[in-house]
């Protein structure tokens, strides 16, 4: 039957599943066609185990019933007297034709007149059960009570949930995990994590964080900065110019092999040529392509977390976003991680920062699916009013059933662990969070060490005397009598030009002092810059050069910096020596200073203040530039020296 979306969806299942389900569907239809006046054949009880276990989970099955003419009633799907028997027959024949083709026999699904399929027997009495809102319900299978209506939207919702719950098992493939691990500079990341943990311990003597917590932070930063890239529209494959979205293209066999059922057409009007953008859903392929939008980002990032041995789960938001959660053993809770934003532990980012109208957010791991909507909202009544796609009792029982099936072969200890974690989550969900003005959804709770590790407080500078970086002349710089340093914000790297192009990775590593500062990447605008942390009234950053230890003194200095402000934001630049302080503009031009002559110390400082409203922190920025300007530097200091 042309245009039957239900049959098309049904045909996407494996042959084994299709044959089982199609037999049931044909039987339901044949019972009505042969016995048009028998009411019992016009009704299917939703609580019937045959329906709930064999039809409900299968893609397209329930849609076929709706296309036949069945309608939802309170406890049943009913074929009303007003429904078209001819329409039912057409859908039935379409399914039968596909079944014949798959069986390779012409008489397997014959017409109703010749059919020998017995009528569907009367279903057994329903099993009594009651919906429980308690966490224990997640650990035991409880059939959905017959009073819960089942709708086409329920079928769509369940299919999405089951698809995601099945997909996360891909991350558990040992060979795929090994392949992913080979893509990660894990030794470097673990080294950085140890250093970050040391800084957290310095900031808070009572720090109870673990190395894995820091590893997550470094993995997020590396993934966004060095591994994966965002795609709006791909450049033209012929001229490299801009393209415009222009519908979809048919997926190739290779696309389908890598689970890309959708291929976007990015069209170049100059070349009149299409560039294909397959939306791969197979994380193995994403290790190769390393690009996409939030779906590809979260899919690949979750795999990398599992490859590193982190407990991770894939988070699906029904308002069209996905991300990851990682379980922190030290904090005994699930931590929000958004690789697109390089955001960690900021669950209110979407509702408060982005203004999203949330409704359903589900978490999927190899052992469990959970409704975690309430972690991501501080407006619970508003969210509840929007949760109308499925009934709450139906959702609860569906999740319980899926968990019971997935966990049936787990050991008692693991089951108890999952249950205990669920209890902790439920307690967390009871009290909605209250973001403070200017947080932009950033989490200000948590230990001082945790906030310091994430760069969200000036506490990371509490031990400034032991963390200050001072540049002193190397032997080659002493010989050339010249010091030259640059910083590239896109690569987040310093280049010590005068010392054999020595590189220093990380904006903090070349700084003397920093206070309330962080590096921000905007994937929507494709821009990057340094700014003060969210909620901070000011930010400060300085760089120091001292040539006295090398027996040298300064003759002159030149500085080039660039800053950008919006609304009432301000950036004040200054250059200080042992005796004087001079202010200068951050206009991107090279400014020379002769008044440094004879001095031995030089400090360049930027102070960021002002701005309006909740995004005031964004209104004063250092070194703002495109993420595509990989060679551009907007910070440069040159010092000419002579012997003392």
Curated annotation (Swiss-Prot):
Molecular function GO terms recorded: metal ion binding; peptide-N4-(N-acetyl-beta-glucosaminyl)asparagine amidase activity
What do the Gene Ontology cellular component annotations say?
Answer: cytoplasm; cytosol; nucleus
In this protein, which residues make up the domain named PUB?
20-81
Under the heading PROSITE patterns, the entry gives: PAW
Q: Which Gene3D superfamilies match?
A: 1.20.58.2190, 2.20.25.10, 3.10.620.30, Peptide N glycanase, PAW domain
Q: Name one Pfam family in it.
A: PUB
Compartments where located: Cytoplasm
EC number(s) reported in the record: 3.5.1.52
List, alphabetically, the InterPro entries matched.
Answer: Galactose-bd-like_sf, Papain-like_cys_pep_sf, PAW_sf, Peptide_N_glycanase_PAW_dom, PNGase, PUB-like_dom_sf, PUB_domain, Transglutaminase-like
Q: Which residues form the signal peptide?
A: none
* PANTHER family on file: PEPTIDE N-GLYCANASE PNGASE -RELATED (PTHR12143), PEPTIDE-N(4)-(N-ACETYL-BETA-GLUCOSAMINYL)ASPARAGINE AMIDASE (PTHR12143:SF19)
**What protein name is recorded for this chain?**
Peptide-N(4)-(N-acetyl-beta-glucosaminyl)asparagine amidase
User: Which species is listed as the source?
Assistant: Danio rerio (Zebrafish)
């Amino acid at each position: 039957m042309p245009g039957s979306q239900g049959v098309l969806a049904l045909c996407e299942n494996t042959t084994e599943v299709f044959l089982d389900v199609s037999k049931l569907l044909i039987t339901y239809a044949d019972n009505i066609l042969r016995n048009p006046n028998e009411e019992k054949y016009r009704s299917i009880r939703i609580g019937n185990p045959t329906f709930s276990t064999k039809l409900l989970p299968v893609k397209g099955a329930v849609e076929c019933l709706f296309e036949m003419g069945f309608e939802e009633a309170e406890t049943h799907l009913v074929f009303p007297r007003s429904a078209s028997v001819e329409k039912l027959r057409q859908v039935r024949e379409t399914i039968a034709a596909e079944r014949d083709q798959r069986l390779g026999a012409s008489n397997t699904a014959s017409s109703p007149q010749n059919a020998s399929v017995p009528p569907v027997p009367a279903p057994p009495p329903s099993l009594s059960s009651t919906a429980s809102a308690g966490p224990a319900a997640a650990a035991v299978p409880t059939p959905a009570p017959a009073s819960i209506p089942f709708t086409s939207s329920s079928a769509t919702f369940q299919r999405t949930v089951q698809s995601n719950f099945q997909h996360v098992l891909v991350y558990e493939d040992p060979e795929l995990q090994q392949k992913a691990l080979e893509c990660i500079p894990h030794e470097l990341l673990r080294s950085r994590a140890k250093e970050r943990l040391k800084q957290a311990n310095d900031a808070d003597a009572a720090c109870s964080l673990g190395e894995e917590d820091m590893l997550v932070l470094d993995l997020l930063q590396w993934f966004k900065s060095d591994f994966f890239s965002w795609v709006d529209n791909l450049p033209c494959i012929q001229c490299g110019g801009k393209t415009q979205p222009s519908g979809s293209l048919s997926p190739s066999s290779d696309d389908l092999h890598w689970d890309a059922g959708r291929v976007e057409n990015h069209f170049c009007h100059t070349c009149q040529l299409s560039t294909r953008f397959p939306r791969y859903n197979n994380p193995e392929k994403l290790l190769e392509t390393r690009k996409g939008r939030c779906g590809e980002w979260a899919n690949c990032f979750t795999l990398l977390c599992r490859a590193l041995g982190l407990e991770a789960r894939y988070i699906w938001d029904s308002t069209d976003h996905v991300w990851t959660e990682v379980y922190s053993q030290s904090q005994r809770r699930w931590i929000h991680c958004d690789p697109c934003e390089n955001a960690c532990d900021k669950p209110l980012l979407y509702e408060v920062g982005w203004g999203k109208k949330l409704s359903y957010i589900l978490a999927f791991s190899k052992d469990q699916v959970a409704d975690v909507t309430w972690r991501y909202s501080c407006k619970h009544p508003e969210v509840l009013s929007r949760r109308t796609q499925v009934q709450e009792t139906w959702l609860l029982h569906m999740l319980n059933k899926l968990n019971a099936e997935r966990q049936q072969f787990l050991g008692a200890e693991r089951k108890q662990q999952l249950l205990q974690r669920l209890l902790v989550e439920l307690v967390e969900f009871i009290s909605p969070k209250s973001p403070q003005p200017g947080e932009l959804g950033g989490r200000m709770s948590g230990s001082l060490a945790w906030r310091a590790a994430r760069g969200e407080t000036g506490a990371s500078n509490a031990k400034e005397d032991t963390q200050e970086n001072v540049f002193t002349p190397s032997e080659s710089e002493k010989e050339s009598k010249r010091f030259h340093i640059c910083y590239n914000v896109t690569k987040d790297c310093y280049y010590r030009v005068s010392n054999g192009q020595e590189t220093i990775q990380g904006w903090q590593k070349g700084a003397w002092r920093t206070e309330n500062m962080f590096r921000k990447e905007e994937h929507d605008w494709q821009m990057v810059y340094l700014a003060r942390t969210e909620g901070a009234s000011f930010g400060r950053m300085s760089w120091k050069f001292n040539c006295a230890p090398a027996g040298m003194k300064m003759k002159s200095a030149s500085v080039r910096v660039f800053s950008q402000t919006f609304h009432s934001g301000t950036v004040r630049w200054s250059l200080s020596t042992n005796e004087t302080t001079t202010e200068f503009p951050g206009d991107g031009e090279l400014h020379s200073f002769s008044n440094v002559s004879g001095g031995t110390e030089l400090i360049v400082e930027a102070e960021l203040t002002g701005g309006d409203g909740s995004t005031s922190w964004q209104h004063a920025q250092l070194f703002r530039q495109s993420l595509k300007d990989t060679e551009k530097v907007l910070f440069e200091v040159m010092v000419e020296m002579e012997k003392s």
